[in-house]
Amino acid sequence: MSFSNYKVIAMPVLVANFVLGAATAWANENYPAKSAGYNQGDWVASFNFSKVYVGEELGDLNVGGGALPNADVSIGNDTTLTFDIAYFVSSNIAVDFFVGVPARAKFQGEKSISSLGRVSEVDYGPAILSLQYHYDSFERLYPYVGVGVGRVLFFDKTDGALSSFDIKDKWAPAFQVGLRYDLGNSWMLNSDVRYIPFKTDVTGTLGPVPVSTKIEVDPFILSLGASYVF
């Protein structure tokens, strides 16, 4: 992922921290809340607005049996809705399942294949099962981390310059860092970042010529939303 992409990612993180800080000030002054905390047997459901930032790296592009040098693609970022639900097996440890409305990836030819324009499009999204560790609260703030495994699924594959476009579903590791703020009455403000790096196979045809390659994708999912403890 390029440095410019990391600068783009940093902005939503700063915005999320600002929102959490503003919520803290408002709630402390206007809405006294008892600490929600977590207990064994609790469920926490979260609904989020999420921004997907993608870094990508194309492997050797095989065209008709030969490698085409200096070929690359860009995918682009997208905004979507996500949902996850966690079950607390203890006051600090939870099992979390995460899904979302699929994001749209638009593969654009770059460098030696830039003249192809839009290569293909596909909807995609991970289904992630994670084990989370929730730290003890700091005032009303509840930080947490998670690690797990996700299945990256691809839907609605659309041809562009590349015909018979296909991209394979893949398993991938998943990492998460998050922070919740207790608003009271079982409601919490949620902010988290997930990272799901994976490499997958892409095939298709360019006219009558078969094309194949591998693409490494490094998506960050930045989310901001509400959580409910029950």
Curated annotation (Swiss-Prot):
Keyword Nucleotide-binding recorded: no
Pfam families, per database record: OmpW
Domain of life the protein comes from: Bacteria
Signal peptide from the UniProt entry: 1-27
Role according to the record: Could be involved in the transport of substrates.
Family: Belongs to the OmpW/AlkL family.
Lineage, top ranks: Bacteria, Pseudomonadati, Pseudomonadota, Gammaproteobacteria, Pseudomonadales
Record localization: Cell outer membrane
GO terms classed as biological process: transmembrane transport
Originating organism: Ectopseudomonas oleovorans
Keyword Membrane: yes
Gene3D superfamilies linked to this entry: 2.40.160.20
Record key words, sorted: Cell outer membrane, Membrane, Plasmid, Signal, Transmembrane, Transmembrane beta strand
InterPro entries, A to Z: OMP/PagP_b-brl, OMPW
GO CC entries: cell outer membrane
Protein known as: Outer membrane protein AlkL
